[in-house]
């Protein structure tokens, strides 16, 4: 009987010990889970912080890109305007210089018209002026100065200025029959219109402009 009682007590002791072991195991497991959840929570917070920092960094990068782009565009505009200003200044200076040269050309042409090329006493003068004029015209031609000498051409109000109209059986109506003064174009821009007499055709009355 005593043996049965002892066994029963031993079983109770064993069950109690086993229960304590299970309880401790459950406590440890619960602690581990709580610790893991805490670590996961901290990790999530850290990830959110890093994502926010990355977003801010990307925003700053985009802002810097915009600043660089605007600065580059501004510099390009400044360069373009400077180039345009230089070009305008160059054209203005060239145009002013060309305008100063036109009377010189006109005077040499008038000198040729008023000099007898066949007379011995004036032949050398004529040839000298003619050679100088050709050289002069050739030089200014290199800078884009072209003469407008429309004799026999149709009247063009964009390049010609009519000083009058006359009947002419030789020239069709609205044709330049005489060039009173040559015009000039500088780099495709009209510098001075040609002063011309325009034909009315085979009949009509003289009309002065």
Curated annotation (Swiss-Prot):
Family matches, as NCBIfam families: PRK14139.1 (NF010737), PRK14140.1 (NF010738), PRK14150.1 (NF010748)
Name recorded for this polypeptide: Protein GrpE
Region Disordered: start-end pairs: 1-33
Record-linked InterPro entries: GrpE, GrpE_coiled_coil, GrpE_head
Compositionally biased residues, Acidic residues: 15-31
CDD domains in alphabetical order: GrpE (cd00446)
Main location: cytoplasm
Native source species: Shewanella woodyi (strain ATCC 51908 / MS32)
Keywords: Chaperone, Cytoplasm, Stress response
Role played: Participates actively in the response to hyperosmotic and heat shock by preventing the aggregation of stress-denatured proteins, in association with DnaK and GrpE. It is the nucleotide exchange factor for DnaK and may function as a thermosensor. Unfolded proteins bind initially to DnaJ; upon interaction with the DnaJ-bound protein, DnaK hydrolyzes its bound ATP, resulting in the formation of a stable complex. GrpE releases ADP from DnaK; ATP binding to DnaK triggers the release of the substrate protein, thus completing the reaction cycle.
One Pfam family linked to the record: GrpE
Keyword Cytoplasm: yes
Oligomer and partners: Homodimer.
Disulfide bonds: none
UniProt family annotation: Belongs to the GrpE family.
Subcellular location: Cytoplasm
Gene from which this protein is expressed: grpE
Biological process according to GO: protein folding
Coiled coil (UniProt feature): none
Gene Ontology terms, MF aspect: adenyl-nucleotide exchange factor activity; protein homodimerization activity; protein-folding chaperone binding; unfolded protein binding
CC per GO annotation: cytosol
